Amino acid sequence: MTQDHIVTERPPATRNDTAGNATARTYEVRTLGCLMNAHDSERMAGLLEDAGYIKADPGAPADLVVFNTCAVRENADNKLYGSLAHLAPIKASRPGMQIAVGGCLAQKDRHIVLDRAPWVDVVFGTHNIGSLPVLLERSRHNQDAQVEILESLRTFPSALPAARDSAYAAWVSISVGCNNSCTFCIVPSLRGKEADRRPGDILAEVQALVEQGVLEVTLLGQNVNSYGVNFADPDPSTGEEPLPRDRGAFAQLLRACGRIEGLERIRFTSPHPAEFTDDVILAMAETPAVCPHLHMPLQSGSDQILKAMRRSYRRDRYLGIIDKVRAAIPHAAITTDIIVGFPGETEHDFEQTLDVVQKARFTSAFTFQYSPRPGTPAADMPDQIPKNVVQQRFERLVALQERISLESNRSLVGTRQELLVVAGEGRKNATTARISGRARDGRLVHFRPDSADGSVRPGDLVDVEITDAAPHHLIADGPLLQHRRTPAGDASERGQTPTTRGVGLGVPRITVAQAQIPSSGTHPDTACR
């Protein structure tokens, strides 16, 4: 195999039905973990559909089940192996059924997955998503499990076709990998060092999505505001020059996305406080399409714990960023991530976290109980906190944040909010007939359409007046103030989602039949937040 190409074939994704007729094989992708994983799952689905598979109907048994896994939290491990155990007898009763395990846990536990679940057919990692169809066919042909884990990225996942889940909102990856070394996190060792997509390629993908009706994009990266430190090399066929390091690249990217006609909402996740710069705040404030929402992980409010976590910022730095954001964008919603019970966390350390939460007045927070992950420095630290202490602190933190969230949401009662109508995110019952939408600042709003005739569709935009509030959502039970039907709503009504082909990304493309594929065995290279 040459170094310039990763090779794919178009394997025959068919099976025989009960009458002996060849029919397309069905697939299901189950995602565990973060937004990066969810976006990778869209790429896996796109690859499979490109190879001839069709998506299984909800609740119907699939001929292929793919797990895209997470290695950050223990419950993701438990969920994976519990699901695999549940599938074992189903697979035994369905000749030809296949199971594949990919993602961060597969990258980390490459030698363990088959020991614990020998009925798995394919194990692949974070760096070779594009190999999935070939590995499935090789396993089927050889009647043997295939394990292929690469140690470095050859192709950006965004170079692969995608089967998007939504007609109106899309994720767009701007980088992969991470250059930080947080002691609780295993992602850098699984996804590698940061590599940034070239801005022209990102903008081309966003433009293609908008042309298909998408109204909102979320720019994804492990650390979006370090974008520009390591641009990928250009595709040699383009004749483009390599791009120099550019610390202002993320702010420039936000402004450039904001100039794309038809793109109404821009979000991004997640920035790192240590590298958050004033030019990004200015770009957020001056670009109308950028939503007034900042999700910025805190992790702890104690300088001592932040140092132990290797977070490379301190509480005053964090609070200073929030002050600047609120000065420039007074109505911004600010959300965060917090870990409780990190090794060595004292009661004073925890009270420091509560103090930052009080001062920051987060709109909402994702709160987690620390769990040691093998392979991370924190797992071997002394002074691991007893479970009962962690639970008690967790409950105190949640109670405080719930109170702050409710106060924040109540402050919006009586205000007018523009909502992007969403599918599957809220309450809808026979009594209220409510459906749901997301405000520009990201808050979930349950509202009552003027009629139940389906004229308000996912992807449409509506204006409502907020009538009530709860910690995790808002209510708008009055009449609609405005309803704008959109091309995204038209597509949603038709059940149509955008399709994106590979865009030139400055790393080797997947190409068809440019070198010989080994017919069996393990690839020689075998071995996140």
UniProtKB/Swiss-Prot annotation:
Instruction: Please state the Enzyme Commission number of this protein.
Output: 2.8.4.3
Q: Where in the cell is it found?
A: Cytoplasm
Which positions bind [4Fe-4S] cluster 1? 34, 70, 104
Q: Where is this region: Disordered?
A: 1-21, 481-504
Name the Pfam families on file.
Answer: Radical_SAM (PF04055), UPF0004 (PF00919)
Q: Which GO terms describe its cellular component?
A: cytosol
Q: Which domain of life is it from?
A: Bacteria
Q: Supply the InterPro entries for this chain.
A: Elp3/MiaA/NifB-like_rSAM, Methylthiotransferase, Methylthiotransferase_CS, Methylthiotransferase_N, Methylthiotransferase_N_sf, MiaB_methiolase, rSAM, rSAM_horseshoe
Q: Which residues form the TRAM domain?
A: 410-480
Give all residue intervals belonging to the Radical SAM core domain.
164-407
Extract the SMART domains matched here: Elp3
| Molecular-function GO terms, alphabetical | 4 iron, 4 sulfur cluster binding; metal ion binding; N6-isopentenyladenosine methylthiotransferase activity
State the signal peptide span. Answer: none
Q: How is the cofactor bound?
A: Binds 2 [4Fe-4S] clusters. One cluster is coordinated with 3 cysteines and an exchangeable S-adenosyl-L-methionine.
Identify the residues that the record assigns to the MTTase N-terminal domain, covering every copy.
Answer: 25-141
Which positions bind [4Fe-4S] cluster 2? 178, 182, 185
Main function: Catalyzes the methylthiolation of N6-(dimethylallyl)adenosine (i(6)A), leading to the formation of 2-methylthio-N6-(dimethylallyl)adenosine (ms(2)i(6)A) at position 37 in tRNAs that read codons beginning with uridine.
Q: Which family does it belong to?
A: Belongs to the methylthiotransferase family. MiaB subfamily.
Subunit organization = Monomer.
What this protein is called in its record is tRNA-2-methylthio-N(6)-dimethylallyladenosine synthase 1
Which organism is the protein's source? Answer: Mycobacterium marinum (strain ATCC BAA-535 / M)
Q: What is the lineage of its organism?
A: Bacteria, Bacillati, Actinomycetota, Actinomycetes, Mycobacteriales
